[in-house]
Amino acid sequence: MSDAEAVLLLEELKRLKQENELLRQKLDALARRIFGVKSEQLDKNQLLLLLQEVETPGPVLGKGSGPEAELAEPPRPNKASSSKPRDRKPRLPEHLPVVEEVIEPEPFKAAPQEWRRIGEEVSERLDYEPAKFLRRRTVRPKYVKRHEIDAVPVIAPLPNSLLERSVVTPGLLAQIIVSKYCDHMPLYRQESIYWSRHEVWLPRQTMAEWVGLAADWLKPIYRQIREEVLEGGYVQIDETPIRYLEPGHGKTKLGYLWTYGTPKEDVVFHWETSRAAACLENILPVEFRGVAQCDGYQAYRSFARSRDDAIVLAGCMAHVRRKFFEAQEQAPKVPGWILWQMRNLYTIESQLRETRAGPNLRAAIRGSQSRMIMNRLHHTLIALKTSRRFLPRSLMGAAIDYALSQWSTLLVYLDDGRLEIDNNLIENAIRPTAVGRKNWLFIGQAEAGERSAILYTIIENCRRRGLDPFSYLKEVFTRLPSMTNWQVKDITPKAWARRQCIVPLQAAA
């Protein structure tokens, strides 16, 4: 074997080793994602051990030097003075109706006249009665005047109904929709439950028609929610895949449920059969001017460029953090240092939320504290990229490249106090659809995707506003047939909760 051949073999061996290492990293990352702990929380003591040998340029938010200073947390407010004691919920909810059962002792029942009552002992337990169907019969008496036999009789008109000549009522329709889109129960399961437990036969095809017509009735409310979300000039946006049935082929294709909304406000679901940049034209209208916060998917950049300077993209720190978290197995020390700097960024955000800081104060604090951490992170990432210490295709190399490619968008939140540090709030809104997708696997044809988007929008905004979706939908379905378009703004979940003085759920904030 010649020297040249030996060199080629050594290079090939080196390449194969690198490729094998990359494949092992990807396999380990996939195994952790499927079987491992889902939490991305960091252990402070573990990171301190890893960072003992890391030279740090100086403290971020604490005094001194070294890894202990780098890991020092920003001072938190005194919990004893700032945190409110949690309200202890009653063992049995006070609002429930009471069914009282009196149990008399046997000696008293045998001779009640010989006994005198001196007190009682009361105990309560929680009981449940299953839901039940009932036949709602509407009787409209006819009348004629006593002395005018030939006069036209009078009779009360039938109340307006969503579905004429249908047996469904607002209550039943609300129950079917809530069961599917809130409790993730497919129509075929509802069909089985109603028949086996109640002996009521409701074919799934009939229920599907009712759901479709209900979505059509709710479209004006959906459009009103969308209009209110877009008028704020700041939206968070993400998309999730959902399979739908391809007409005439019996096969499924991949569609996408795009989700966008404003933190602490409403959210909108939008159905498209792809995730191309052109889909965003149907989501953000031409007149929209403002900030769109999203992940690093290329379609967002292409769309923003097509709108010139009308749309500013803000990045998502959580996506960047997740990639470094997955790269810890490859080189724990370097990702650990980066992750802790990001932890300091999130600690600042937590303090701002605890103090209920407004947009101006948020921007000022971020400019004085968060920007310093971001600058340090940027210098470190550039140094790591220049050193070529990590292969570009490795988990760490990919994390570095992704962070640097998104850096300009990650800085946007520093100067605008309205913005969040990441896109997690809109991703949380998508989670219920993932649970439903596991149960019903795919939706009907593409048109069903649009109806699902409308109904998911209503259900999710009820949840965010602390409303019972069943009660809300039942009342709305009762009122809608008698309402005009200009009255729609008064029956959105937001307006409904405001009239009832309901505080939005903290989880949605």
Question: Can you say where each PLM-predicted feature lies in the sequence?
Answer:
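Acidic/histidine-rich catalytic cores and adjacent linkers
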Residues: Y297-A299, W340-A509
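Short, amphipathic alpha-helical "recognition" segments used to contact nucleic acids or chromatin
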Residues: T169-D183
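Flexible loop/turn segments at secondary-structure boundaries
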Residues: H184-P186, A215-W217, I242-E246, V267, ...
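Short helix/loop capping segments that flank catalytic or ligand/cofactor-binding pockets
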Residues: R116-G119, P153-A156, Y244-E246, V268-H270, ...
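Conserved beta-strand -> loop -> alpha-helix junction used to position metal-binding or nucleic-acid-contacting
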Residues: Y234-V235, V291, G296, A304-Q341
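Mobile genetic element proteins and their domesticated derivatives, centered on retroelements
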Residues: G36, F108-A111, K145, I176, ...
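Gly/Pro-rich turn-and-neighbor structural signature
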Residues: L92-P112, R116, Y188-E287, L352-R418, ...
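Short, flexible loop/hinge motifs at secondary-structure junctions
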Residues: M1-V167, Q236-I237, R243, C294, ...
